[in-house]
């Protein structure tokens, strides 16, 4: 698995990164990053066209194959055509993916329900590089009834996604949180509450007790929990473990109350 970190991260971590993502406002920073991290691919966010294109064009010519643009706009304009690029928004349907590929895009973020058809994506577009944000359960403007049906990936499940997903990057409000989440996913193990790692899930569940065997099912399940209201393997697994955790908590509280009462008596 490849890992992408934001350019404002610590230098020692950027030295480990396979890819470094530069915010649009910091696009000039790409010049130094190319030289400081020669093994890394540099991805520059493009939110609008108010930048000095000659800088990026010069970098693209000097370091062929190392500069990629991440476009927040869906229209492919003349300025983009000499660069490798993908879109910052999710491709959720076959129409989204087909349209992107027809524009020359060969990688991108895949959202639901397409996320749950990894084998079909690989079969139809074997050279398309799927990107994922594993600690984000879902995106979009519509409220979700249950984020368990979303596109989250646990650290332990990385091995199942490696044949399909090329790169992980992380949803993180700060460099410190990104560092922590990155290290957990690179270690491929998390022994704490899954809600701490993937906040949208909102399940008080100890991650290490979630059955690993059920997770490969998510790869190609077609999200039947939503399309046919069937399966519900993911939310059942999370709720079951959360119920066990609550039972243990209540049992421990009763034990504590009883011990305190005995001491008082």
Language model segments and positions:
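Active-site pocket-lining/capping segments in soluble small-molecule metabolic enzymes
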Residues: 1-96, 103-265
């Amino acid at each position: 698995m490849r890992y992408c970190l934001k350019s404002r991260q610590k230098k020692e971590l950027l030295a480990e990164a396979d890819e470094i993502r530069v915010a649009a406002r910091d696009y000039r920073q790409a010049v130094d990053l190319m030289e400081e991290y020669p093994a890394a691919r540099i991805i520059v966010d493009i939110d609008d066209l108010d930048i000095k294109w000659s800088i990026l064009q010069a970098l693209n010519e000097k370091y062929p194959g190392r500069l990629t643009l991440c476009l927040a706009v869906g229209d492919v304009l003349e300025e983009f055509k000499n660069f490798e690029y993908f879109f910052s928004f999710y491709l959720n349907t076959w129409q989204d993916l087909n349209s992107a590929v027809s524009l020359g895009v060969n990688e991108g973020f895949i959202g639901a329900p397409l996320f749950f058809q990894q084998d079909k994506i690989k079969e139809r577009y074997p050279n398309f590089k799927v990107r994922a944000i594993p600690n984000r359960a879902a995106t979009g403007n519509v409220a979700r009834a249950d984020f368990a049906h979303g596109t989250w990936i646990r650290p332990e499940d990385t091995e199942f996604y490696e044949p399909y997903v090329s790169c992980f990057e992380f949803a993180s409000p700060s460099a410190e949180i990104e560092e922590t989440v990155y290290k957990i996913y690179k270690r491929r193990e998390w022994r704490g509450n899954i809600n701490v790692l993937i906040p949208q899930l909102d399940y008080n569940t100890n991650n290490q007790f979630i059955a690993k065997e059920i997770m490969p099912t998510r790869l190609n399940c077609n999200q039947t929990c939503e399309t046919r209201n069937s399966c519900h393997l993911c939310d059942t697994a999370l709720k079951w473990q959360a119920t066990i955790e609550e039972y243990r908590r209540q049992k421990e509280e009763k034990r504590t109350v009883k011990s305190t009462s005995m001491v008082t008596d």
